[in-house]
C-alpha cells in the first residue's frame, strides 16, 4: 500500500505508532502528539489535553501578575515602621512578614513560569512539541491552522477552559506543508489497527 513503508510499531506497547506519538514511561501509554509528562497535573500532555495545559500556564501567569499589581501599592508598608511618641515601634510585624513572603513567592513563580509559558505557546504557534522540537518543520502549516489543531476551530472557544469542539484532527493524521498526511494502516476488515493512542486522556487535574 502507498506509504506502508513509513508505518511504525511501538516497541514498548506493540501497537501501531502514529506520527508524532510517543510512549510515556510514567503512564505506560502510547500518547498522541505527546509533549511531555507533567508531574504538577499528574498526566501526560498530548493531543486531547494540550489546550488545557496551555491555558493552565496562561491563567496562572495572569493570576500571579494580578497579585503582584495588587500588592505593589502596599510595598512602602514594608519599610513604614510605626513609632509612638517615645520612638518605640508599635507593631505590624506579622503584616510586613506576610507581605514580604507573598511578594517574594509571587515574583519567583512569575519569573519561573513566565518564560516557560512563553516557550510552550511559541511551540504551539509553530506546531512543535517539547519532544520533537524543530526537527519536524513540515508540520508548521501556518499560525492559525497550527493553533486550531490544539485549541479548536472556533476562536471564541480558544481561551475557554472547556473541551468545546475539541482540537482539529484526530491526532493520527497530520497535514504538512506539502498537503500530505500520514496514512493509518488498515486491518483485514478495512478498519484501522488497534492503538491505545486513539483513547483520549482524562482531563487535567
Where in this protein do the model-derived segments appear?
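Membrane-associated feature with strongest affinity for ZDHHC
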Residues: 1-205
Amino acid at each position: 500500500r502507498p506509504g506502508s513503508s513509513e508505518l511504525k510499531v511501538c516497541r514498548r506497547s506493540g501497537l501501531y505508532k502514529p506520527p508524532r506519538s510517543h510512549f510515556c514511561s510514567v503512564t505506560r501509554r502510547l500518547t498522541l502528539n505527546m509533549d511531555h509528562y507533567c508531574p504538577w497535573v499528574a498526566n501526560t500532555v498530548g493531543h486531547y489535553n494540550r489546550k488545557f495545559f496551555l491555558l493552565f500556564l496562561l491563567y496562572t501567569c495572569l493570576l500571579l501578575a494580578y497579585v503582584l499589581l495588587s500588592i505593589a501599592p502596599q510595598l512602602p508598608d514594608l519599610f513604614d515602621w510605626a513609632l509612638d511618641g517615645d520612638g518605640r515601634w508599635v507593631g505590624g510585624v506579622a503584616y510586613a512578614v506576610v507581605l514580604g513572603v507573598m511578594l517574594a513567592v509571587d515574583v519567583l513563580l512569575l519569573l519561573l513560569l513566565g518564560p516557560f509559558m512563553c516557550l510552550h505557546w511559541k511551540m504551539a504557534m509553530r506546531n512543535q512539541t517539547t519532544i520533537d522540537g524543530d526537527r519536524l518543520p513540515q508540520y508548521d502549516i501556518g499560525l492559525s491552522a497550527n493553533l486550531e489543531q490544539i485549541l479548536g476551530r472556533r476562536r471564541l472557544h480558544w481561551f475557554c477552559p472547556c473541551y468545546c469542539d475539541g482540537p482539529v484532527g484526530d491526532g493520527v493524521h497530520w497535514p504538512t506543508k506539502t498537503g500530505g498526511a500520514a496514512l493509518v494502516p488498515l486491518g483485514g476488515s478495512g478498519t484501522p489497527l488497534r492503538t491505545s493512542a486513539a483513547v483520549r486522556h482524562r482531563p487535567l487535574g
